[in-house]
A protein has these predicted regions:
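Short cysteine/histidine-rich metal-coordination sites, predominantly Zn2+-binding motifs
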Residues: 57-63, 76-85
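Short helix-to-coil "ATP-lid" hinge immediately C-terminal to the conserved N-box Asn in the Bergerat
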Residues: 68
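N-terminal pre-ligand scaffold of iron-sulfur
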Residues: 1-57, 71, 84-101
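Short cysteine clusters
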Residues: 43, 62-65
Length: 101
């Protein structure tokens, strides 16, 4: 595994979203409620990118079929129990935030 810097901390604010591809993995870095989150940029239901999904109250909704997932733990909220959203632990290094992949 290697550290991959994603963004400078000073640029993160609620509403922030940015796509990355690292080692062939599509990622989405976003911030909501003062907390940055890094998720796989792919709905586990049908594989659609989540870049333009609605985010509110700690939940992201897939723009394709409306499935919703908790950002805090990846659990499927709607339509009910289902495949989980893949989340990645963020690492703070100096003035940057990144991930080990």
């Amino acid at each position: 595994m290697a550290f991959h810097a994603l963004e400078k901390l000073m640029f993160l604010e609620d509403g922030y979203r940015r796509e990355f591809v690292i080692n062939g993995i599509p990622l989405l870095l976003l911030q909501e409620g003062g907390r940055p989150q890094l998720i796989r940029n792919q709905c586990p239901h049908r594989g659609q990118p989540l870049t333009h999904g609605d985010v509110s109250n700690g939940v992201i909704r897939c723009p394709g079929h409306g499935w919703s997932f908790n950002l805090s733990d990846g659990q499927c909220r709607l339509p009910g129990p289902g495949p989980c959203l893949t989340r990645y632990a963020l690492i703070y290094e100096g003035t940057q935030i990144g991930v080990d992949l």
